[in-house]
Every structure is written in structure tokens, then in C-alpha cells.
Amino acid sequence: MSELKIKAAKAAIAYIEDDMVIGVGTGSTVNFFIKELAAIKHKIEACVASSKATEALLRAEGIPVIDLNSVQDLPIYVDGADEVNERGEMIKGGGGALTREKIVANVATQFICIVDESKVVKRLGEFPVAVEVIPMARSFVARQIVKLGGDPEYREGFVTDNGNIILDVFNLNFSTPMALEDSLNVIPGVVENGVFAKRLADKVLVASASGVNNLK
């Protein structure tokens, strides 16, 4: 599996141009991308990190990291997904960085999703949806999610970079992913959720034994 993730990471490097500021996601596949990026760090201007973990990895490779607030234009954002379909809709947030990932993805002009073939699905929903919640609202939000048909589970011992908690939600109805994304976000106490149906991936680079294909 690592070999496929490395393939996908290498394929994304082809989209990096000189003097770019690059948005960098979070997760195991992205970690391989950071390793590849280190080889051309002299060509890029800097990176914007979607998590403290990613920032630490970038700095460890000697890659400059800048704050998103200092960036007006972000040409490209590279990140993985827990699930992705052929339309570029995704479930993200297995690593708990979904809120910052969604922010950086929305700033970026182009979102390149890098995955191995096991992450490609016809219909989203097998993987649970991470919902970032303000701690005091945890029980209330969980009850509201149950009303939507979901089965929320508190992610024990995990605190997001924003100081919040995560509810992992199973069995949600993905017949209309965009409506689901909205219905979760309007619950008071919800910061963000891991359904990416409004900000789609522009390119989905899928690695398999035979090579890397662009799903979109």
C-alpha cells in the first residue's frame, strides 16, 4: 500500500511550478508528498500547512511554512481522502484535520486529491464522517446527528488543532452529499464536517499497480 501512496505523491509533483505557494494537506499519503516536495524545495516559495502535524513535517524537511492569512493567492492544494468518487466528492477527516483542510482547500485555485485505488468508491458513506464539535456541545450535537439518521461515536482522547473534539458518524444518508454537508454544519456547536461535496477535488490522482490515473 505504501508503494501506491508513493506513486500518487510523485504524480502530484508534476503539478508544482517554480515559485509556487503550495497548500499541503494531512495524512499518510500527504506525508509521502512532503518527502517528494523536499527534493524540489529550492524551486518553491513556501507551503501553507493544514495541520500542526503537517507543519512539523514540512519544517523538518527544511521547507518554508507561511500562515494562510499572509497569502492572497494559493494556486494549488494537495491532500488525500478517506473516500472519493468520480465526481471528486470526498469524505475526509480521518486524521482530524478536516476544518483546516476545508479552509485551505477553499482558498486554493486547484485541489489535487492523491489516493491509492482502495479509496475510490461509487457511493460515499462506508467510511465514517468526522464532525468537529465545540466540547460543551458534544451531547447536544450527538443527539441532533441521531435525528439525521447517523450513529455518532466520540473519538476518545483526541483534541483537534483548534481545541475541539471529534464525533465520528456512521450510517449517514449520502443520497445528496451537498445537502448532508449543509445539514451537519447548521447544527449549533458543529465547527465543520468531513463531507467535501461543495469544494470538490479538481483532479483525483489514483495510484494502482498499473500506474496513476486521473479520475477527473
UniProtKB/Swiss-Prot annotation:
Keywords: Isomerase. Its EC number is 5.3.1.6. Homodimer. The lineage of its organism: Bacteria, Pseudomonadati, Pseudomonadota, Gammaproteobacteria, Legionellales. The keyword Cell membrane does not apply. The gene is rpiA. Belongs to the ribose 5-phosphate isomerase family. One of its GO terms (biological process) is D-ribose metabolic process. It is an enzyme of class 5 (isomerase). It comes from Legionella pneumophila (strain Corby). HAMAP family: Rib_5P_isom_A (MF_00170). This is Ribose-5-phosphate isomerase A. GO terms for cellular component: cytosol. Catalyzes the reversible conversion of ribose-5-phosphate to ribulose 5-phosphate. InterPro entries: NagB/RpiA_transferase-like, Ribose5P_isomerase_typA_subgr, Ribose5P_isomerase_type_A. GO terms for molecular function: ribose-5-phosphate isomerase activity. The active site is at E101 (proton acceptor). It comes from the Bacteria. Pathway: Carbohydrate degradation; pentose phosphate pathway; D-ribose 5-phosphate from D-ribulose 5-phosphate (non-oxidative stage): step 1/1. Substrate binds at T26, G27, S28, T29, D79, G80, A81, D82, K92, G93, G94, G95, K119. The keyword Isomerase applies.
